């Protein structure tokens, strides 16, 4: 094995090692999820050297430099305020979802008008309209980190795969017998998973357009699904009050996560694939051990349905969004509530962290989106201007752009 090159990933912090083995170029990553500005660099380098044979004495100084660069980024102060850059009359009927590509240079909007549109973030220009569905386009996703393909899931029971560059439709995936309401690409961008009101999830091959497997095991609609970062596991959340963990290569059930007393609204993996979070209409969120399937904690405190849940990039924090009009941030170490985000005047349907993990963004039926400080729980900014409820919001990877999607048929870009 011979080390060829090292490069870094900012969020979550990590160092990539490109190396040669048996004449082939390979890559491995050293995750530095606990890195802070206070981390002792010398000590960390010693730990890395002890654990990683590719790191020899000749490259220790470079490793130190890379860690210092990551520390600088992690410790960056984030004082920015967001301003409305563009309000886009995106669709003739209400939007269903919005999503960024990895770099944030483009984003997509799905709509009741049966189309998905691709937009240029910098100019607000429409790049492509993806037409062909015969009903509402409900679930949409880029194949991040690549960003060259888009998948759309529709109430017409099909999923379509498109070129993000040309807007051309590669494949239409047929097989579900009811509406498709959630979908995701695996991290390798070789598979698309779709979840449907027909109680099944399906895996589709991106290259051939063929169905790979049907994941049958739920007794009610599948409303949410998520791949882990290695792509070998998929979790599905259902109205049958359970989540199921699946082995992707075999299509077999690994664990049934049962314990909620109401429908599941959202399921998420953390970055290192060790935890799964489930949000439920039973007013709670549960955290599960992804390996053994045990429930590690029930996160309580909301007095109405929990509608969304997400991890920050390092997997150390969980944010919840509830119909009670509040959001909460919990520690994955202690499972204690660190702060309560209060200020919205109606249910919060969406919550997300910026990549740095310093901010939380929420979308609410009160027609506003809010930016919150994770450390203090203070509301830093109210993004106003939509004339109807906001159901979707997203940060780009750099954390300097926000998109909000509303039932007023518009999408807003905030810089």
From Swiss-Prot:
One of its GO terms (cellular component) is SCF ubiquitin ligase complex. PROSITE patterns: WD_REPEATS_1, WD_REPEATS_2, WD_REPEATS_REGION. It holds the Pfam family WD40. Disruption phenotype: Defects are the cause of a phenotype related to primary ciliary dyskinesia (PCD). Embryos have curly tails, pronephric cysts and left-right asymmetry defects. It comes from Danio rerio. It comes from the Eukaryota. GO terms for biological process: axonemal dynein complex assembly; cilium assembly; cilium-dependent cell motility; determination of heart left/right asymmetry; determination of left/right symmetry; intraciliary transport; otolith morphogenesis; outer dynein arm assembly. Keywords: Cell projection, Cilium, Cytoplasm, Cytoskeleton, Flagellum, Repeat, WD repeat. Belongs to the WD repeat WDR69 family. The gene is daw1. Required for axonemal dynein assembly and ciliary motility in ciliated organs, including Kupffer's vesicle, during embryogenesis. Facilitates the onset of robust cilia motility during development. The keyword Repeat applies. It is found in: Cytoplasm, Cytoskeleton, Flagellum basal body; Cytoplasm, Cytoskeleton, Flagellum axoneme. Expressed in organs bearing motile cilia, including the pronephros, otic vesicles and Kupffer's vesicle. Signal peptide: none annotated. Its main location: cytoplasm. SUPFAM superfamilies: WD40 repeat-like. GO terms for molecular function: ubiquitin-like ligase-substrate adaptor activity. The keyword Cytoplasm applies. This is Dynein assembly factor with WD repeat domains 1. InterPro entries: G-protein_beta_WD-40_rep (IPR020472), WD40/YVTN_repeat-like_dom_sf (IPR015943), WD40_repeat_CS (IPR019775), WD40_repeat_dom_sf (IPR036322), WD40_rpt (IPR001680). WD repeats lie at residues 90-129, 132-172, 175-214, 217-256, 259-298, 301-340, 343-384, 385-415.
């Amino acid at each position: 094995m011979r080390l060829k090159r090292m490069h870094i990933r900012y969020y979550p912090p990590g160092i990539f090692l490109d190396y040669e083995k048996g004449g082939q170029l390979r890559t491995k990553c050293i995750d530095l999820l606990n890195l802070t500005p206070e981390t002792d660099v010398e000590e960390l380098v010693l730990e890395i050297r002890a654990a990683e044979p590719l790191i020899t004495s000749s490259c220790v100084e470079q490793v130190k430099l890379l860690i210092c660069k990551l520390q600088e980024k992690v410790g960056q102060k984030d004082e920015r305020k967001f301003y409305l850059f563009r309000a886009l009359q995106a669709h003739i009927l209400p939007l269903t979802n919005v999503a960024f590509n990895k770099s944030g240079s483009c984003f997509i909007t799905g709509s009741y008008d049966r189309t998905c549109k691709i937009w240029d973030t910098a100019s607000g220009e429409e790049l492509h309209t993806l037409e062909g569905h015969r009903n509402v386009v409900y679930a949409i996703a880029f194949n991040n980190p690549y960003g060259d393909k888009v998948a759309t899931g529709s109430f017409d029971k099909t999923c379509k795969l498109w070129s993000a560059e040309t807007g051309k439709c590669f494949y239409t995936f047929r097989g579900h017998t009811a509406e498709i309401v959630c979908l995701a690409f695996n991290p390798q961008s070789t598979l698309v998973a779709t979840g449907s009101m027909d109680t099944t999830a399906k895996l589709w091959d991106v290259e051939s357009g063929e169905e790979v497997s049907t994941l049958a095991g739920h007794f009610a609609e599948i409303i949410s699904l998520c791949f882990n970062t290695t792509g070998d596991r998929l979790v599905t959340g259902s109205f049958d009050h359970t989540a199921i963990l699946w082995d992707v290569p075999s299509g077999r059930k690994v664990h049934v996560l049962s314990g909620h007393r109401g429908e599941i609204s959202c399921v998420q993996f953390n970055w290192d694939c060790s935890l799964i979070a489930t949000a439920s209409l039973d007013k709670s969120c549960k955290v599960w051990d992804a390996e053994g399937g045990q429930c590690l904690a029930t996160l309580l405190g909301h007095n109405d349905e929990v509608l969304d849940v997400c991890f920050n990039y390092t997997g150390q924090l969980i944010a919840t969004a509830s119909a009670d009009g509040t959001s909460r941030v919990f520690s994955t170490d202690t499972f204690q509530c660190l702060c309560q985000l209060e200020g919205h005047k109606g249910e919060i349907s969406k919550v997300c962290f910026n990549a740095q993990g310093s901010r939380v963004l929420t979308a609410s039926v009160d027609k506003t989106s809010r930016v919150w400080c994770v450390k203090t729980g203070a509301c830093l900014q109210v993004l106003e201007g939509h004339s109807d409820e906001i159901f979707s919001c997203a940060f780009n990877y750099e954390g300097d752009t926000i998109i909000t999607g509303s039932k007023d048929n518009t999408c807003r870009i905030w810089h």
